[in-house]
UniProtKB/Swiss-Prot annotation:
GO BP annotations, alphabetical order: cold acclimation; nodulation; response to abscisic acid; response to cold; response to heat; response to water deprivation
GO cellular component terms, A-Z: cytoplasm
Subunit structure: Interacts with the leghemoglobin LB120-1 in the cytoplasm; this interaction leads to LB120-1 protection from denaturation under thermal and drought stresses.
Inactivation phenotype: Reduced nitrogenase activity in root nodules, lower ATP/ADP ratio, increased expression of nodule senescence genes and higher accumulation of amyloplasts under dehydration conditions.
Source organism: Medicago truncatula
Name used for this protein in its record: Dehydrin CAS31
Length: 312
């Protein structure tokens, strides 16, 4: 045996590039496939598979998974002196990738509008109504003479002028002031009355009654008074009436009552102010005189004037 071994020598054991022993029989490639052929055995081809990983895209609140099958085909070609060897086909690899999807839930802050309360302040304006004014008109009334026939005849005689004038003027707001004038009956004798009838004698009686009332009210107009003049003629005897009929004699009796009332208009609650009525009263009372004194009054040139009475 040794000679054989020495004759042929010990053959060096060959291995491939990966360290696999190379034999003429029973050689396998890197995948374990048997290699057959004569001559020199080429290097074993290597197949490399390429694999791509795919990640599944997760949906919100869902776990996604993706499957991928990678196919790798590798050809290893080695040309040796003994022949050509083609490596086997690469294997198949299947990879299943599971991707977990993070689910993020975002919550936005909700602004809730509060209820605002506004306080409004209103200023009410109080209106004031104007107060109407009333105008009172005074009335002047003439009294009636309760005289006899002769007295009335004298009034009819031409040239005699007997004026009985009474003026009542009321100007104001409200009630009117009243002026009264009265001529009392003369309780005189016959001669006294004859003197009044003598021509040239002038007996004028003037009486002024002035009433002034001032009323002040708040709201409603105050009321004052305006005057009314009244005139009355006293009862006279027969001779007195005859004298009034004699031409040239003039007996004038003037009664004037003037009342003025002012009402002041106020604002607010209604009040009523009343003006006090002024009265002017004048009365002529009959004088009980002797016969000579009455005759003296009847003499021409003598005048009997009675003054003014004024009441406020």
């Amino acid at each position: 045996m040794s000679q054989y071994q020495q004759g042929y020598g010990d053959q060096t054991r060959r291995v491939d590039e990966y360290g696999n022993p190379l034999t003429s029989q029973g050689q396998v490639d890197q995948y374990g496939n048997p290699i057959s052929g004569g001559g020199m055995t080429g290097a074993t081809g290597h197949g490399h598979g390429h694999h791509q990983q795919h990640h599944g895209v997760g949906v919100d609140q869902t776990t996604g998974f993706g499957s991928n099958t990678g196919t790798g085909t590798g050809y290893g070609t080695h040309t040796g002196s003994g022949g050509t060897h083609t490596g086997g086909v690469g294997g198949y690899g299947t990879t299943t990738e599971y991707g977990s999807t993070n689910t993020g839930s975002g919550y936005g802050n909700t602004d809730i509008g509060g209820t605002g309360y506004g306080t409004g302040t209103g200023t009410g304006t109080t209106g004031y109504g104007a107060t109407g004014g009333g105008t009172g008109v005074g009335y002047g009334g003439t009294g009636h003479d309760n005289r006899g026939v002769m007295d009335k005849i004298k009034e009819k005689i031409p040239g005699t002028d007997q004026n009985a004038s009474t003026y009542g003027t009321g100007t104001g707001y409200g009630t009117t002031g009243i002026g009264h004038q009265q001529h009392g009956g003369d309780n005189r004798g016959v001669m006294d009355k004859i003197k009044e009838k003598i021509p040239g004698t002038d007996q004028n009686q003037y009486t002024h009654g002035t009433g002034t009332g001032t009323g002040t009210g708040y709201g409603t107009t105050g009321y004052g008074a305006s005057g009314v003049g009244h005139q009355q003629h006293g009862e006279k005897g027969v001779m007195d009436k005859i004298k009034e009929k004699i031409p040239g004699t003039e007996q004038n009796t003037y009664g004037t009552g003037t009342g003025t009332g002012h009402g002041t208009t106020g604002y607010g609650s209604t009040g009523t102010g009343h003006g006090t009525t002024g009265y002017g009263d004048e009365q002529h009372h009959g004088e009980k005189k002797g016969i000579m004194e009455k005759i003296k009054e009847k003499l021409p040139g003598t005048g009997s004037c009675t003054g003014h009475g004024q009441g406020h």
